C-alpha cells in the first residue's frame, strides 16, 4: 500500500515507528502538499464570488496550478521513500569478492544520486508552489487570508526539510561535479523559496 493511501493516524504511526521509512523526506513532502492544498482551498473559496470577480481569471489559474502541484507533492511522499529503499537495497548486495565490492560501491553511488534527485525535485515543486501562492495574496477571499499564511509556513518547512535530505544524500556521493551542481542549485532554490515564504507570511500578518 502506498503511503498516500494511509489514514492520517496510520501515517503518523508508521512515521513514529522504528521502520527505516518513511522518514523526514516523506514528512517534508506531506508538509508541502498540505501547504499547496491550503492555497487550492483559498481559491475554491474565492472563485465565483462577486466581490472578487475582477480576479476570477487569475485565481482560476492559481487554482489549476495548485491542483497540479498538489498531485506532484502528494506523489513525492512515496517517491522519497522509494528512493531511500534503493539505498537500503544496496546493503543486501553480496560483498564476498572484490568484484562484489566494486559492484556494491557503484550501486551505492547511483542510489545516492537518485536519492538526491528526489528531494531536489521536491524543492523545485515547492518553489513553484510558493510562487503560485503569492499570486493569490491580496486577490483572494480575505476570510481565508490566514490560510495562505499557513500555506506559506508549510511550504517553507517542506522546502527546508527537502534540502536537508538533499544534503545528507550528497554527503555520500563521490562525484564532485555532481555534488557541486546539486549543492549550488539547491542553495538557490532554498534562498528564493525561504525569502518568498517569509514575504507571503509578512503580507498576511498585515491583513489578519
Question: Locations of the language-model features?
Answer:
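Phosphate-handling active-site elements
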Residues: 38-58
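Conserved phosphate/anionic-ligand binding catalytic regions in large, soluble enzymes, centered on
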Residues: 17-40, 144-162
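Polytopic transmembrane helical bundles with strong interfacial aromatic enrichment
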Residues: 3-6, 121, 168-169
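Preference for long, well-ordered alpha-helical segments
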Residues: 129, 144-203
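Amphipathic alpha-helical interface segments
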Residues: 80, 84-153
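A structural signal for well-ordered alpha-helices, especially hydrophobic packing surfaces
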Residues: 42, 70-77, 84, 116-123, ...
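A structural-propensity feature for long, helix-poor, extended segments
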Residues: 51-89, 189
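Short, hydrophobic/aliphatic alpha-helical segments
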Residues: 3-21
Amino acid at each position: 500500500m502506498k503511503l498516500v493511501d494511509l489514514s492520517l493516524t496510520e501515517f503518523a504511526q508508521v512515521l513514529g515507528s522504528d521502520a527505516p521509512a518513511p522518514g523526514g523526506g516523506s514528512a517534508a513532502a506531506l508538509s508541502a502538499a498540505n501547504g499547496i492544498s491550503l492555497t487550492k482551498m483559498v481559491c475554491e473559496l474565492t472563485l465565483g464570488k462577486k466581490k472578487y470577480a475582477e480576479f476570477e481569471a487569475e485565481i482560476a489559474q492559481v487554482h489549476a496550478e495548485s491542483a497540479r502541484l498538489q498531485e506532484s507533492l502528494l506523489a513525492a511522499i512515496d517517491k522519497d521513500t522509494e528512493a531511500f529503499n534503493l539505498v537500503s537495497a544496496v546493503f543486501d548486495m553480496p560483498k564476498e569478492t572484490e568484484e562484489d565490492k566494486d559492484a556494491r560501491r557503484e550501486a551505492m553511488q547511483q542510489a545516492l544520486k537518485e536519492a538526491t534527485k528526489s528531494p531536489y525535485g521536491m524543492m523545485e515543486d515547492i518553489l513553484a508552489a510558493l510562487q503560485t501562492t503569492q499570486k493569490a495574496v491580496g486577490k483572494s477571499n480575505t476570510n481565508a487570508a490566514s490560510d495562505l499564511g499557513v500555506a506559506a509556513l508549510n511550504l517553507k518547512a517542506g522546502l527546508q526539510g527537502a534540502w536537508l535530505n538533499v544534503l545528507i544524500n550528497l554527503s555520500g556521493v563521490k562525484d564532485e561535479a555532481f555534488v557541486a551542481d546539486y549543492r549550488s542549485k539547491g542553495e538557490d532554490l532554498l534562498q528564493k523559496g525561504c525569502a518568498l515564504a517569509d514575504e507571503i507570511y509578512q503580507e498576511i500578518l498585515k491583513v489578519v
